[in-house]
Amino acid sequence: MKDTE
């Protein structure tokens, strides 16, 4: 999962 998109 990424912290930001």
Curated annotation (Swiss-Prot):
Other comments on record: Under acid-stress, this protein is expressed at a higher level in wild-type B.cereus than in the acid-sensitive mutant strain NB1.
The protein's name in its UniProt record: 88 kDa protein
Lineage: Bacteria, Bacillati, Bacillota, Bacilli, Bacillales
